[in-house]
Each structure stands twice: as structure tokens, then as C-alpha cells.
Design a protein with these regions (language model features):
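Sec-dependent N-terminal signal peptides
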Residues: 2-12
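PEST-like low-complexity, intrinsically disordered acidic/proline/serine-rich tracts
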Residues: 15-234
Length: 234
């Protein structure tokens, strides 16, 4: 299933910002920050439903895989919700987002999105933006829930062992914690890293890697484009 954000016009935000400053971003700018910016990348991943130990994964072994909840949404927005309907085969690919949800621009865009989508009180904007997180967070957003057929704790353990971020040619940094949360038929995986001095860098690239066994991701982000209001935002 292709998510709605991949149909939007391609415009990477980061090095170049819209004329209007926050909080006067329009809906298009909000969605671009959340889904196609210096802090967020869309990626199509191939799903290999073969265990690395002998045997294949059977669709009937996955709780809830054959029948979706009756009240599931038909489209996936940049903050949540999934498709619905009877699933007859395991998906062969998935469209996911790899992003830095703790970066201030994403927190601001998320707050604006929620206020407009959920009809919340605009006076709660600063409350919704919140304070910076203790950890630097990389999020894998929109992962098919079937991957967690053995439970989210298994996914957390697998990602904790495999994930890294690497700044330039420096030694890869491993996460201190992983949080996997199911949302109907999708799952969001948050990978938490200590904020070592490398996270304040302003040059080079940072490469994100994670292996979930059914698929793996490797994505580079350019630190020079991740500057916002005079500082690195990760």
C-alpha cells in the first residue's frame, strides 16, 4: 500500500525554508516537514518473509493479520492511522518514514498538525511542542504490524542489537533503548541514543542503520541541512 504522502510534490525542506515563519506554516508546509524534509525521509522497503532460521512465516500465524479492525482508517496520515480490509497475503513491500521526531521543526509541525486535525485549542501549541527529549530519537514510522507477529518486545530486542547512527567516519553509536508501539495495522519504532557530542555537529553526514530481519534500512542525513534557528536539530 502506498501512503498518501508519497503522492505529494517533492520538496526537501531544511536548507531552504518557506517565506512564512512558524507558526504561520500552511498545511502543505506542515506535511512536508513531517514527511519530506531534512529530518524526515520516505523510503520503500522490500519485505522478505523468510525467517533467518529454517521455515517461513505463515500469514495465519500472525494474530489479526487476516482481518483488520472494522473501524480502521482508510489512509495513513503523517501522525497515524492505517488502511483497512481483509488481508489475503503478506505485503511484499512497505512505504515507511525514517525521521528525527525530537527535532524542533518536527515537534512544531506535529503540534500544528494535531491542532488542525484534532480541532484542539490553538493556545495549547507550546504545550504540544513540548521540551526537547533527553535522548536523540530516530523513528521508523509506518512499519507493517505483521513484522511484530512475536510481539513488540522481540522487535525492540532485534533493533537494539542491530541499530546504529554514524557521524562521518566516526565510530558507530549504538542505542540505549528501543520502543515499538502498535497502531492498528502499523507499528512505530523509536530508537533512542544518548546525546553524545557528535549530535551537536554541523557538518558531514549522519547515517542511520537498523536491521529488523524482515527488512533493513540505511539512510544518510546531511547535517548542514539540519540546522534550524542557528543550531543543529536532531
Amino acid at each position: 500500500m502506498r501512503f498518501v504522502w508519497f503522492a505529494m510534490a517533492s520538496l526537501t525542506l531544511g536548507a531552504e525554508w518557506p517565506e512564512k515563519a512558524f507558526p504561520d506554516w500552511n498545511d502543505d508546509t506542515v506535511r512536508k516537514v513531517l514527511t519530506d524534509s531534512a529530518w524526515s525521509r520516505g523510503k520503500t522497503v522490500k519485505l522478505e518473509w523468510v525467517k533467518r532460521d529454517p521455515g517461513n512465516i505463515n500469514l495465519r500465524d500472525i494474530p489479526g493479520a487476516l482481518h483488520a479492525p472494522a473501524n480502521a482508517n482508510q489512509s495513513l496520515g503523517p501522525l497515524g492511522g492505517i488502511g483497512r480490509g481483509k488481508k489475503e497475503t503478506l505485503p511484499s513491500k512497505a512505504d515507511i518514514l525514517i525521521r528525527w521526531p525530537g527535532a524542533l521543526p518536527l515537534r512544531q509541525a506535529t503540534a500544528l498538525y494535531r491542532i488542525r486535525e484534532e480541532k484542539l485549542d490553538p493556545n495549547k501549541l507550546n504545550e504540544l511542542i513540548g521540551a526537547p527529549e533527553k535522548y536523540a530519537v530516530v523513528e521508523l514510522f509506518g512499519v507493517p504490524a505483521e513484522i511484530a507477529h512475536q510481539g513488540t518486545s522481540v522487535i525492540e530486542s532485534i533493533v537494539l542489537r542491530s541499530a546504529t547512527v554514524q557521524f562521518g567516519n566516526a565510530k558507530p553509536i549504538r542505542p540505549v533503548k528501543v520502543e515499538a508501539k502498535l497502531q492498528a495495522l502499523t507499528m512505530n519504532v523509536r530508537i533512542l541514543f544518548d546525546r553524545t557530542p557528535e549530535f551537536s555537529a554541523k557538518s558531514a553526514d549522519v547515517e542511520v542503520y537498523a536491521d529488523l530481519q524482515i527488512f533493513s534500512v540505511r539512510e544518510k542525513f546531511r547535517l548542514s541541512q539540519m540546522q534550524y534557528r542557528g543550531r543543529s536539530e536532531l
